[in-house]
């Protein structure tokens, strides 16, 4: 009977540890979502894709 109590206590501690870690993860994800700044616009002098078309064109050397 004593062995059953020890196993039960270990399982309870593992469950508590798992819930603690889950709470940490969820809290971190909520914090990241709440502090995300998705409204950032590119600076006016930022290179446009059309400005780099000559760099992206494949060159074939013969």
UniProtKB/Swiss-Prot annotation:
Q: Which residues form a coiled coil?
A: none
Q: Which UniProt keyword terms apply here? A: Activator, Transcription, Transcription regulation
Under InterPro entries, the record lists: Transcription_activator_RinB
Would the keyword Nucleotide-binding turn up in this protein's UniProt record? no
A Gene Ontology annotation in the biological process aspect, one of them, is: regulation of DNA-templated transcription
Function recorded in the entry: Activates int gene expression, probably by providing stability to rinA. Int activation requires both rinA and rinB.
What protein does this entry describe? Transcriptional activator rinB
Task: State the organism's lineage.
Answer: Viruses, Duplodnaviria, Heunggongvirae, Uroviricota, Caudoviricetes
